Amino acid sequence: MAQHTVYFPDAFLTQMREAMPSTLSFDDFLAACQRPLRRSIRVNTLKISVADFLQLTAPYGWTLTPIPWCEEGFWIERDNEDALPLGSTAEHLSGLFYIQEASSMLPVAALFADGNAPQRVMDVAAAPGSKTTQIAARMNNEGAILANEFSASRVKVLHANISRCGISNVALTHFDGRVFGVAVPEMFDAILLDAPCSGEGVVRKDPDALKNWSPESNQEIAATQRELIDSAFHALRPGGTLVYSTCTLNREENEAVCMWLKETYPDAVEFLPLGELFPAANKALTEEGFLHVFPQIYDCEGFFVARLRKTQAIPALPAPKYKVGNFPFSPVKDREAGQIRQAAAGVGLNWDENLRLWQRDKELWLFPVGIEALIGKVRFSRLGIKLAETHNKGYRWQHEAVIALATPDNVNAFELTPQEAEEWYRGRDVYPQAAPVADDVLVTFQHQPIGLAKRIGSRLKNSYPRELVRDGKLFTSNA
């Protein structure tokens, strides 16, 4: 694999020499940093099993190497890397996999380790959505996830990835993560804080990542991280699990932040060792039981992961002074809900008791039941999935609901050819050789739902959202 030149400040190299355990070679560290990062993907098990995914993609000649800490994760090598971007493959467009760095799969593995099965989870810094979608898959779309993102521009990307992966149990918020300890005290069974950091571990992806690095900046970032972990710890219920992670390598933003929390709440913080998380985890294990992953250990990004349990309640923070405002939705009455459910089933959309129908004007939404306890405590940017808009003749079913709820074995499902599917993703109407009979047609490709079409004569009218329409090379050019 080709080398690339990474910029290293002298003070950073000095700090790394001090931070690196004697069992590791500093020369190996430098050599690993100069190698470009291996690509990796995670199969979205909400859509397809790992076995079926491997069978589906076998004809492509991809080399898929299992990632030890994530059963559905693989390093991927392709002969035609430049011919077709991974993000333009049919399997990516339909949400069958997520392009995710291998080491960033570690925090969620830690969150669910040892049979942990939380029902209400918060992802404090969620965009672009790799970990939120991984959590949702581990929860099998059950329970509820609060996915928060402070950056307004990244909330849209977060929602797009959640929608593409067919996830229905997520509520999105857009806050500074420091508000949650006050706003929702002791409300969550598990919390992932993948904290904003100095990014020292990402030099293999971005050789200039350390251009603005300084020890002073690290100290400022660590101060913010202490405030974030304190807030998250307050939002965690007694007995709950908190995973703290970063993609940086210095001890100040990693071990020291966790030790600060333990010193602040000595009777309430218990570190849960991660040495048994996967075979060879002990190679990255610190004396506290954390994983401090230098890039040469597993040939991935540098990363840090700590897992802890809240063993008892801690004093509450002062009550919030802000007002959330009125919640603009109301629950749909049982009788009407039954009619809506029946109409939705007619086009192949089904849901279980984890989701409940709510209404706002002519909009129908499905919210995860587990999030209802948070209504009135935080303001949501987006909640659950938009099911439909009502109109005089019935319902206008929404694309995100089709992707999350459709069952491809529905009687009105219509399988497209590769060429027709590509036309669909380009936002064009499709003219199949033999048009389906039904007026509302569940469009599938590779037996995966990709949208809902209206049949008009022999034409299938495209309803693919304009913001998702693709141009450039798509999958048939790779056939």
Curated annotation (Swiss-Prot):
It is found in: Cytoplasm. The keyword Methyltransferase applies. Its EC number is 2.1.1.178. It comes from the Bacteria. Gene3D superfamilies: 3.10.450.720, Vaccinia Virus protein VP39 (3.40.50.150). It holds the Pfam family Methyltr_RsmB-F. The active site is at C247. GO terms for biological process: rRNA base methylation. GO terms for cellular component: cytoplasm. One of its GO terms (molecular function) is rRNA (cytosine-C5-)-methyltransferase activity. S-adenosyl-L-methionine binds at A125, A126, A127, P128, G129, S130, K131, E149, D176, D194. The keyword Methyltransferase applies. CDD domains: AdoMet_MTases. Specifically methylates the cytosine at position 1407 (m5C1407) of 16S rRNA. NCBIfam families: nop2p (TIGR00446), PRK11933.1 (NF008898). This is Ribosomal RNA small subunit methyltransferase F. It comes from Escherichia coli O9:H4 (strain HS). The lineage of its organism: Bacteria, Pseudomonadati, Pseudomonadota, Gammaproteobacteria, Enterobacterales.
